[in-house]
Amino acid sequence: MNLNKNLPTGTRDKLFREAQAAYKIEQQVNHYFEKRGFKRIETPVIEFEDVFSSEHQADAKLYRFFDEKGRLTVLRPDMTLPIGRVVSTTGVMLPLKLSYSGKIFRANEDFGGEQNEQTQAGIEIIGYPSIKAEIECILSGIGVLNALEIPNFQIELGHAAIYRRVIQLLNLSETAEIDFRQLIQNKSLTGIKRFVANNPSTLDDFILAIPRLFGPATAILNQAKSLTTDKGILTALREMETIVEAVSYTADISVDLGLVQDFHYYTGIIFRGYADLAADNFLSGGRYDHLLEQFTSSSSPAVGLALNLDSLTTLQNRAGIIKKQTPTTLLIHYDLEALPQAEKFMQETPNSELSFFETASNAISFAKKWHIPEVVHVSSQGIQTILQREVD
């Protein structure tokens, strides 16, 4: 089968207006992070598989291939682990505030509707144990969404320590933990009720309530505190309360105590961003204080935020925010000996471009086809208008 006209699963072309909008969004996001004091970092698209082979990345669906020396390499499925590699191996001084943007690749299943190639931008705050690092990530995410004029978005908070504490007390096998994780993610009331009956613990009331513990932050957190006396869970709930109180003035903040991230490296506060016009989250992040241990014997506290720029481009388009590209209003046909004058005239004339046709008649035909209202001819004799008309 000849595939030279097809694209791999989960990839797509972007043309003209969409491509320009995606480019501008990436610029805006990077500029916003720069204004907040973040330093840009870039890592290769290709990494050795070992960077992503830890238990933290067990669920990642990788594009794998061998290099010329037979070593297994992958296309990066996220940016966090490569940045962890850089920080751990280059000897840069902590603490750090880093920003990035670039492509990531995940080999999702066919017909799942997910994009295997995504443009991602984000920040990593490394070396700050304070809760102010989480607050900075959330404020930065909210600031970006406001700068991009994303309408009706909301930030949802969770805490990885809640799920970890439940798993620790239940002492589940790996298979049982996977099943339980799925029940939590699906908010399956019936499934969790059956699970609790088969795995009784001191957290029964809390676990049974997890599928319903999402919504307005203050009410849900108060309800959750009334369902458990476990110190670990209560500490996590208090951290969530602190963050809600700190950032709620900036955006609509909700909580979901059943929020479980796809990557296992999160240890503390986790968060996502949603909007009315989006089917899935386009912002995610959280704290992962042990991630760097994969690359070095010491650990460093870290918090990260990632934005799916492709989803944000789609959101802007649905909201009618993306502006039409400025049309060409003047086509400049020129004789070769008059190229310097034509180039100077183009530089001084907004929304103009040079014609590449040999004859003036072809330039005029092109202008009519593409609704360009005016054509001039630049020669050694000067500049002459050869087409001028109104365009609907």
UniProtKB/Swiss-Prot annotation:
SUPFAM superfamilies: Class II aaRS and biotin synthetases
GO terms under cellular component: cytoplasm
Pfam families in the record: tRNA-synt_His (PF13393)
Subcellular localization(s) per the UniProt record: Cytoplasm
InterPro entries per record: aa-tRNA-synth_II/BPL/LPL, HisRS-like_core, HisRS/HisZ, HisZ
Keywords: Amino-acid biosynthesis, Cytoplasm, Histidine biosynthesis
CDD domains, per the entry: HisRS-like_core
Assembly, per entry: Heteromultimer composed of HisG and HisZ subunits.
Miscellaneous comment in the UniProt entry for this protein: This function is generally fulfilled by the C-terminal part of HisG, which is missing in some bacteria such as this one.
NCBIfam families: hisZ_biosyn_reg, PRK12292.1-3
Protein name: ATP phosphoribosyltransferase regulatory subunit
Source organism (scientific name): Listeria monocytogenes serotype 4b (strain F2365)
